Amino acid sequence: MLFHSLSGPEVHGVIDEMDRRAKSEAPAISSAIDRGDTETTMPSISSDRAALCAGCGGKISDRYYLLAVDKQWHMRCLKCCECKLNLESELTCFSKDGSIYCKEDYYRRFSVQRCARCHLGISASEMVMRARDLVYHLNCFTCTTCNKMLTTGDHFGMKDSLVYCRLHFEALLQGEYPAHFNHADVAAAAAAAAAAKSAGLGAAGANPLGLPYYNGVGTVQKGRPRKRKSPGPGADLAAYNAALSCNENDAEHLDRDQPYPSSQKTKRMRTSFKHHQLRTMKSYFAINHNPDAKDLKQLAQKTGLTKRVLQVWFQNARAKFRRNLLRQENTGVDKSTDAALQTGTPSGPASELSNASLSPSSTPTTLTDLTSPTLPTVTSVLTSVPGNLEGHEPHSPSQTTLTNLF
C-alpha cells in the first residue's frame, strides 16, 4: 500500500486505525460462519442460486420448499394431477410418466385390480379367480345366495355382476325359488330327483321342487320334424284330400322347425298361405310335380315365398299324391273283388275263364288327366261285370269313384 503526501505520524495513525477495525470485525464474521453451519439442514434457497419449481415453472424464493422425484416444488404446487389433492402434508406421493398422483388415484389407475366382491386391492402374489372381466379373491368367489365357495371346474352363472352356483342360477332364471331357498334345499331336491330317476318314477316324482336342470346348452330340435301318421285305409278319402282343396274359406299351413325348450311340448311355427299363392302352386303342380331351381325361383317371385318353403310344399304335395294313388288303386281292387263275389263270378283255372262273355275285363281302369292346369285331376275307376251271368241284375249301375286331389 502506498501513501502519498502524508507525513510519518499521519501514516502511523492510519495503520493503527485499520488494525483496530480488523480486530473488531473478526468476532462478527466467525459468529456468522458458525450460525450458517447450524442452519444448513433447513431447505432454503439463496438469491444467487434460486431454482425453478417443477410445478409452476417459476423461481422458488420461499425459505422452505419441497423436494420430490429429484425436483424442487413450491409447497402449494405439489398436487395430485387427478383429484388436485395438496400433497404437502401427505406422507407419500407417486410419480408415473412425469405426473404426480396421490396414493388412491395411483392404486386405482396403475395398481392391480380390486376384488369385485369385497372391493379390496389384490396384490400381485395372490391367487385370484376370474369371471368375464372381473377378478375375485379365492375366498370371495362364492354364490351370492348360499355363499357356497366355487372352485375350479364348478359350474356357475352370472347376472348383473353377481355370481351364483349352478342350482341357484337355474332357479333364478325360472324365477320360482323363494327368498329363503338355500343350497341345502336344492341339494336335497337334486338327490331326490336322482333317486326317483333310478327308481323309474315319472316326471313329477323326478323333480319335486319343479326346477329345470340346466346343462348350459339350449336344447334345439335337430333334423326334420317327425312325420304325422297318415290316415288308415278305411279313412274317408274326401276328408283326407281336404288339406289340398283350395276354396275361399280354407288355407293350407306348412310345418317348419322351431327351437323349443326341453321342458315343454314341441311347438312349431306354422306358415299360412294366401289363396292366390295356393292357386299358383297347385296350378304348377298339375304340370310339373318336381320343379327345378329355375322354376322355384320364378314361383318365388310370383308368390312372394322363399324357395325353401316352396320346396317343402312340393315335397309334401308329391307325397300326398303318391299316397292317394296307392290308396285309390287298393280301393278299386277291393271294390272289384266285392262285386265279383256278389255276382257269383266262378273261380277256377285261367283256362276255364277264357270265355268271351267275361269281356270287358273286371280289372279297374285308371284314367289320369294332368294336361289342364286349371281343372282338377279326376281318377275314375270303372268296374264292369258281365250281364249274362246268372243271378246278376240286368240294370246294375257301374261303380264310379271320383277323387279330387286338389
Swiss-Prot record:
Q: Which domain of life is it from?
A: Eukaryota
Q: Describe the function of this protein.
A: Acts as a transcriptional activator. Stimulates the promoter of the alpha-glycoprotein gene. Transcriptional regulatory protein involved in the control of cell differentiation in developing lymphoid and neural cell types.
Q: Which CDD domains match?
A: homeodomain, LIM1_Lhx2, LIM2_Lhx2_Lhx9
Q: Cellular component terms, GO, for this chain's entry?
A: chromatin; nucleus
Instruction: Extract the PROSITE patterns matched here.
Output: HOMEOBOX_1 (PS00027), HOMEOBOX_2 (PS50071), LIM_DOMAIN_1 (PS00478), LIM_DOMAIN_2 (PS50023)
The record ties this protein, via InterPro entries, to: HD, Homeobox_CS, Homeodomain-like_sf, LIM_Homeobox_TF, Znf_LIM
The feature table lists the DNA-binding region at 266-325
Which PANTHER family does this entry report, sorted A to Z?
LIM/HOMEOBOX PROTEIN LHX (PTHR24208), LIM_HOMEOBOX PROTEIN LHX2 (PTHR24208:SF80)
User: Domain description from the entry?
Assistant: LIM domains are necessary for transcription activation.
What UniProt keywords apply to this chain's record, in alphabetical order? Activator, DNA-binding, Homeobox, LIM domain, Metal-binding, Nucleus, Repeat, Transcription, Transcription regulation, Zinc
Q: Name one GO molecular function term.
A: DNA-binding transcription activator activity, RNA polymerase II-specific
Q: Find motif (Nuclear localization signal) and give its ranges.
A: 307-323
Does the UniProt entry include the keyword Isomerase? no
Protein name per Swiss-Prot or TrEMBL: LIM/homeobox protein Lhx2
> Which residue ranges are recorded for the region named Disordered?
250-270, 328-374, 387-406
Main localization is nucleus
Positions with biased composition (Polar residues): 328-356, 396-406
Q: Where is the composition biased (Low complexity)?
A: 357-374
Q: Where in the cell is it found?
A: Nucleus
**Assembly and binders:** Interacts (via LIM domains) with CITED2. Interacts with POU4F2.
A biological-process GO annotation: positive regulation of DNA-templated transcription
